[in-house]
């Protein structure tokens, strides 16, 4: 079973969490534009900074998810006598949105799990509608054996011949009559140890919750023959139906949940003064080290300036006609992304690539690897190599000197993940030396907060080691005092960049 699960990790990943909470489906999939455009606001910003009232799912996706649930619930086999018609619930949608924004590949929050059911799905790569995940959840039926009444003495057995069946049982749990879902774009989401650059994360919450131990998901019998009295005998397409229950409530533009509403009021009514600004000296930096490129972009075209050593490649570059010259060492006129596929750094789904310029090489050897035929060249030309972008969690005290000090011609640091509350770390053990360019004796994460690359709640940071500077300037930014340093005897320097 473990081998089977590993085989499907990149196609469909399932996670079962105890306490009878349904699990997750993760179909792997690139070319996100179609889906992602729907989850951007009018200014082209992702919904991570939503205006008040902006919903975390489109009306079309909401209706498609709801319709598919009711269709699947109406056609279960054996037939259900008490399957209830499902409706959309705005409060469940809001709770799903809140959890989706956390970008955590696990069920939650813990405070809600005793009272709701939850199915999760994620993918990155080519466009997949949310209903793709719903259908995948239902398709677990092939591994589920329905427990007939004569088998329940008094508890019904749970028989599942596959990795997990609890997505399916939640979808068809007869009394789970309300659903609310949300979609969020999660950058660099950790899916069972793999970092997905742009994960489209679907969270669906159900109420009343299903998957109660010892119970069948529904009663077997003639459709609608065992509906609760509250339905008044109503039946629609094999589902217990109450007139008017298909109407769902759409929040007005100015409405939001109670917590968000209180926060917005506080924010909106506070009048900021000049002294407020000077006391905090807030600085925000959105400059990125990485660059988004197409399959055809050559390093010779793109490598301009210092921040030209990390790239994000799209999916589908195997189908591109862009040429690649060389093997291991690639000529500067080579496609960055296709060279990365050839070397095995990424596959056709795209991903992150680090590039190191290597100077002139006398010749370049052709080869065929990973579906890409490269060209040979026997003339001297500038070259580059490619390497994998790794991700590493660090502490508030970790320095670049410890992690990845500068070495000529260039050094690559892993993408680091900073924990929360580094502002509160002891400044004697987590020093910040410099402004914008920092001594590599500095704490990476506190320097990132000082530079405005991340806030005190932590997050991902790109680090670029550079050669030492003669002078580092002190400043007070974002609640952190940095130190000055002149003519340091040793050590190098670094810059920090946002990951967005």
Swiss-Prot record:
One family from Pfam that matches here is: CAP
Q: Which UniProt keywords apply?
A: Disulfide bond, Repeat, Secreted, Signal
Reply yes or no: does the keyword Cell inner membrane apply: no
* Family affiliation: Belongs to the CRISP family.
What SMART domains is this protein classified in? LCCL, SCP
What does UniProt give as the signal peptide span?
1-23
Q: Which residues form a coiled coil?
A: none
Q: Where in the cell is it found?
A: Secreted
**Disulphide bonds in the chain:** 295-313, 317-337, 396-418, 422-445
> Organism, per UniProt?
Mus musculus
Taking every annotated instance into account, which residue ranges of this chain make up the domain LCCL? 289-384, 390-492
Q: List the SUPFAM superfamilies hit by this protein, alphabetically.
A: LCCL domain, PR-1-like
Any GO BP: hematopoietic stem cell homeostasis
**RNA-binding keyword on record:** no
The protein depicted here goes by the name Cysteine-rich secretory protein LCCL domain-containing 1
Q: Which CDD domains match?
A: CAP_CRISPLD1
